[in-house]
C-alpha cells in the first residue's frame, strides 16, 4: 500500500509552546482509517473478511465527510479563521485532509482491484455486462423487469423542472439522451433506490459466485426505461451531505426539536460529489451546477463508487474465507450460581470482558430484575441499543410489573437519534419515567442501578460499562462490564442519575469521577502524582487504553510526565494528537493502535503509584470517556476506580498487559502521525491479544492473583521491556 501524505514537521523545531507538538486531529483520524484499510491488505486475514475491512474503511470515510469535513466547510463559510490546536486554520485543515483523502481513496480502489483478483481465484467474481452468458442475460433481464424496473423513477431536467433533490449517500445515474424520432436531446437522472441490492447475485453454478453491479444491469436494459431514446452519454455519481445536528440550547421540547432536525439533516448541505471517471465532462458540470457545490467538493474516481456496498458480497456461504465462528463464554461465576446474577454479584464484584464473555449476562441481569418481586426500582441509561432491544423490553416488562423504572434516553447519539425517539415513546407508554438529560451535555455514561429488598434492608446492584447496551455491537466490540454491590459506588451512581434528571450536582460523590465536573481533574491529578514520584526518584508509570487522545491539556500533562521520566504506554485505537518521540518532550511515551477482528472500545487508565507497572499497588480505573474535550467538558461520563483486588489484577494483568505486548495486530504511531505495523523483534515471541482472549476467555473465572496464563503474559512483557532497553 502506498505511503500516505505525512504530516511533515521538523522535530527539532517543536517546543512545549509550539502548536506543532500536536498532530492534526483530522489527519490522525484518516490514519486510523488507513490502518483499517491495511487490514484489507493483510493476507493473514480470511479473504472475505478483508473485503469487509475495505467496506468498513469506506463507511468510515463517508461518516468523516458527513461530520468532520462538513464541520470544516461550515467554518469556512462562516468566515472562521481561528486555528486548531496544531495551528491550522479551517481552510488549511480542509486542504490538508482532502489531499490525504485522495491518497486513501486511491489505496481503496487499488485494494479492491487486488481483492477482486483474489476473489476470482476463489470462484467469486464481480463481472460486467459483457461477461454475461446468454442464459445469464435472459435471467438478469427478468430480474430487472421484476425487481428493478418497478422502483425506478426517471427524472428529466430542463428549465421548466428544477434540479431534483438527491438524498444523502444517494447513488444515481446521469444520462444524456437523444430521441430517435427527431434527435431532441435532454439530460435525465435515474436515482437508485436504497432498497435495491448494489451487487446482484447471478444463479449459482458449479459452486461459483458471480455478481453484477446494479448500475450495469440498468445500463444494459436502459431501453426499457427510455424506449425510443438513444444514450449519448452516461455515468454514475454519488452525493454526501452534512449530517451533523447542532442542538439549540433554547429548545423547549427536545423530542420535537430532534424530529425537526432529522428532517433538516436529510436535506443538509452537499459536502461531496463523487463522479465515475467515464462520465462525460458536460454531464459532470451540469450536476455540479445543479447542486451548486464548489470545486473542492468534487471528486472523480476511476473505479467503483460506494465501496461500502461490497459488504453485500461477504454474506455468501463461503465459511472457508471468513473468520471461524466464535461463541462467547458465559462467565463462570454466573454458572456457579446457576444463572442467578444477584447471587453472583452479592458474593463478589465481577468484571466481564466482551465479546469474549457473553453480553447476555447484562441482558439477563435486567430481565431478572424485571421479574424479581423483591426488586423495587431500576434506573438505566440508554445511549445506543439494538433495533429489537432486549434491554428496552426488560425495562418495559419491569414497568408493567409495577416497579419504579427510570430511563435516561440520550437523543443526541449521532445517527441513532430516530431510534432513540422511538424507544423513548415505547418506554413512556409502558409507564417508564423517561428523561433526556441536559440539552448542552450528551449523556455517554453506561449505568444500570437496581434496588432490591433483602430482608430488612435495601441493597443496590450496579452495572457500569465501557460500552453501550447494544447486544449486537457487544459481539464485535471489546468492552468491560463491571457488577458490584459496593455502597459507595451505588451512592455515586444514584447521585449521577439525580444530576441528569433533576440537575442536582453530585457534590458528595465518594469514589466515581464524573465529567464535566471532576473527571478531567482526577486524570490530571494522577498524572501529576506520577510526575512527583519520578522527580523524587521513585518508579513512575502510566498505562492508558482509549479510543481517542485529543485533549491538549491531557496531552501536555503527559508530555510533562515524559520529561520527568515517567514511562508511558498508550493504546489508542483511533485519533491520537499526541506526537510521540519528540526529543526532550515525549521520549518516554510509546503509542500503539490495535486493529483486528474485534473493534477495541474499552477505556482503561493505570497509574504506577510509586512502583512500576504492572503492580498490585497500581491505581486502576475504567470508564466511558475518551480523552477528548467533548468527553471531558461536554458529556456526562464516568471514571470508576477499581478497589477490588481481584478485579484490579484482572484488568491490569490480563487486559492491559495483553494489549501492550500484542505484536500481531498492532501499529506503532510514529512522530509524523502515520502508522507502522509492529512485527516481533529478534528474540520476541509473537503474541495476538484478541486470539489470546478468544482462547482464554473468562476474566470472571480467575480465582488466583496469578494463574499460568497471567504468568505467561508477565513473562512476555518482561521480554518486551528487556528488548526495548537493549
Swiss-Prot record:
Binding site for Mg(2+): 384, 414
Catalytic residue list: 444
A GO BP annotation: polyphosphate biosynthetic process
GO molecular function, one term: ATP binding
UniProt keyword terms in alphabetical order: ATP-binding, Kinase, Magnesium, Metal-binding, Nucleotide-binding, Phosphoprotein, Transferase
Known cofactor(s): Mg(2+)
EC numbers on record: 2.7.4.1
GO CC aspect terms: polyphosphate kinase complex
Catalytic activity entry: [phosphate](n) + ATP = [phosphate](n+1) + ADP
Protein encoded by which gene: ppk
Protein name: Polyphosphate kinase
Role, per record: Catalyzes the reversible transfer of the terminal phosphate of ATP to form a long-chain polyphosphate (polyP).
Entry's family note: Belongs to the polyphosphate kinase 1 (PPK1) family.
PANTHER family membership: POLYPHOSPHATE KINASE (PTHR30218:SF0)
Post-translational modification: An intermediate of this reaction is the autophosphorylated ppk in which a phosphate is covalently linked to a histidine residue through a N-P bond.
Broad enzyme group: transferase
List of residues binding ATP: 60, 477, 573, 601
CDD domains: PLDc_PaPPK1_C1_like (cd09165), PLDc_PaPPK1_C2_like (cd09168)
Highest taxon in the source lineage: Bacteria
Amino acid at each position: 500500500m502506498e505511503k500516505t501524505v505525512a504530516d511533515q514537521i521538523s522535530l527539532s523545531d517543536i517546543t512545549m509552546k509550539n502548536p506543532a507538538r500536536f498532530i492534526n486531529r483530522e489527519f490522525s483520524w484518516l490514519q486510523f482509517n488507513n490502518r483499517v484499510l491495511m487490514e484489507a491488505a493483510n493476507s493473514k486475514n480470511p479473504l472475505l473478511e478483508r473485503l469487509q475491512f475495505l467496506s468498513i474503511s469506506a463507511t468510515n470515510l463517508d461518516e468523516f465527510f458527513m461530520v468532520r469535513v462538513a464541520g470544516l466547510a461550515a467554518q469556512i463559510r462562516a468566515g472562521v479563521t481561528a486555528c486548531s490546536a496544531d495551528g491550522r486554520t479551517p481552510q488549511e485543515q480542509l486542504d490538508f485532509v482532502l489531499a490525504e483523502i485522495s491518497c486513501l481513496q486511491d489505496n481503496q480502489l487499488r485494494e479492491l482491484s487486488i481483492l477482486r483478483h483474489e476473489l476470482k481465484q476463489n470462484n467469486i467474481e464481480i463481472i460486467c455486462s459483457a461477461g454475461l452468458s446468454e442464459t445469464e442475460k435472459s435471467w438478469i433481464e427478468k430480474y430487472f423487469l421484476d425487481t428493478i424496473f418497478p422502483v425506478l423513477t426517471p427524472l428529466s431536467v430542463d428549465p421548466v423542472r428544477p434540479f431534483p433533490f438527491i438524498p444523502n449517500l444517494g447513488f444515481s445515474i446521469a444520462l444524456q439522451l437523444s430521441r430517435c424520432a427527431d434527435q431532441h436531446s435532454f439530460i435525465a437522472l435515474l436515482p437508485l433506490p436504497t432498497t435495491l441490492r448494489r451487487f446482484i447475485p447471478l444463479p449459482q453454478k458449479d459452486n461459483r459466485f458471480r455478481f453484477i453491479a446494479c448500475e450495469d444491469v440498468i445500463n444494459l436494459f436502459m431501453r426499457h426505461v427510455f424506449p425510443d431514446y438513444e444514450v449519448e452519454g452516461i455515468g454514475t455519481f454519488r452525493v454526501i451531505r452534512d449530517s451533523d445536528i447542532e442542538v439549540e440550547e433554547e429548545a423547549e421540547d427536545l423530542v420535537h426539536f430532534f424530529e425537526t432536525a432529522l428532517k433538516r439533516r436529510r436535506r443538509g448541505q452537499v459536502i461531496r460529489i463523487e463522479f465515475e471517471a467515464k462520465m462525460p465532462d458536460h454531464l459532470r458540470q451540469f450536476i455540479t451546477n445543479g447542486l451548486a457545490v464548489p470545486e473542492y467538493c468534487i471528486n472523480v474516481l476511476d473505479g467503483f463508487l460506494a465501496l461500502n456496498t461490497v459488504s453485500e458480497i461477504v454474506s455468501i456461504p463461503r465459511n472457508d474465507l471468513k473468520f471461524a465462528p466464535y461463541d462467547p463464554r458465559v462467565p463462570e461465576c454466573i454458572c456457579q450460581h446457576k444463572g442467578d446474577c444477584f447471587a453472583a454479584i452479592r458474593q463478589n464484584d465481577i468484571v466481564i470482558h466482551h465479546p469474549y464473555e457473553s453480553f447476555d449476562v447484562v441482558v439477563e441481569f435486567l430481565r431478572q430484575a424485571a421479574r424479581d418481586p423483591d426488586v423495587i426500582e431500576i434506573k438505566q441509561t440508554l445511549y445506543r441499543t439494538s433495533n429489537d432491544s432486549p434491554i428496552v423490553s426488560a425495562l418495559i416488562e419491569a414497568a408493567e410489573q409495577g416497579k419504579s423504572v427510570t430511563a435516561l434516553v440520550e437523543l443526541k447519539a449521532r445517527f441513532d437519534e430516530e431510534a432513540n425517539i422511538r424507544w423513548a415513546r415505547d418506554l413512556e407508554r409502558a409507564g417508564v419515567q423517561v428523561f433526556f438529560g441536559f440539552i448542552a451535555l450528551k449523556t455517554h455514561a453506561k449505568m444500570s442501578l437496581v434496588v432490591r429488598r433483602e430482608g430488612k434492608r435495601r441493597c443496590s446492584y450496579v452495572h457500569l460499562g465501557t460500552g453501550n447496551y447494544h447486544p449486537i455491537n457487544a459481539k464485535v466490540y471489546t468492552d468491560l462490564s463491571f457488577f458490584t454491590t459496593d455502597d459507595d459506588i451505588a451512592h455515586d451512581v444514584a447521585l449521577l442519575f439525580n444530576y441528569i434528571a433533576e440537575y442536582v450536582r453530585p457534590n458528595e460523590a465518594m469514589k466515581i469521577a464524573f465529567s464535566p465536573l471532576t473527571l478531567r481533574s482526577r486524570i490530571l491529578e494522577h498524572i501529576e502524582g506520577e510526575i512527583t514520584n519520578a522527580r523524587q526518584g521513585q518508579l513512575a508509570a502510566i498505562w492508558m487504553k482509549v479510543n481517542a487522545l485529543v485533549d491538549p491539556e491531557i496531552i501536555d500533562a503527559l508530555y510533562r510526565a515524559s520529561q520527568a521520566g515517567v514511562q508511558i504506554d498508550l493504546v489508542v485505537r483511533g485519533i491520537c494528537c499526541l506526537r510521540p518521540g519528540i526529543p526532550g518532550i515525549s521520549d518516554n511515551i510509546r503509542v500503539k493502535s490495535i486493529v483486528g477482528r474485534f473493534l477495541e472500545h474499552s477505556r482503561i487508565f493505570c497509574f504506577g503509584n510509586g512502583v512500576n507497572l504492572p503492580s498490585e499497588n497500581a491505581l486502576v480505573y475504567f470508564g466511558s470517556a475518551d480523552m477528548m474535550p467533548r468527553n471531558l467538558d461536554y458529556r456526562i461520563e464516568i471514571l470508576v476506580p477499581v478497589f477490588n483486588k481481584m478485579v484490579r489484577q484482572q484488568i491490569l494483568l490480563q487486559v492491559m498487559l495483553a494489549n501492550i505486548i500484542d505484536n500481531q495486530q498492532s501499529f506503532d504511531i510514529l512522530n509524523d502521525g502515520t502508522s507502522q505495523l509492529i512485527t516481533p523483534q529478534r528474540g520476541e515471541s509473537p503474541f495476538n491479544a484478541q486470539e489470546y482472549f478468544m482462547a482464554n476467555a473468562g476474566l470472571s473465572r480467575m480465582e488466583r492473583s496469578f494463574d499460568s496464563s497471567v504468568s505467561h503474559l508477565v513473562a512476555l512483557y518482561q521480554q518486551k521491556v528487556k528488548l526495548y532497553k537493549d
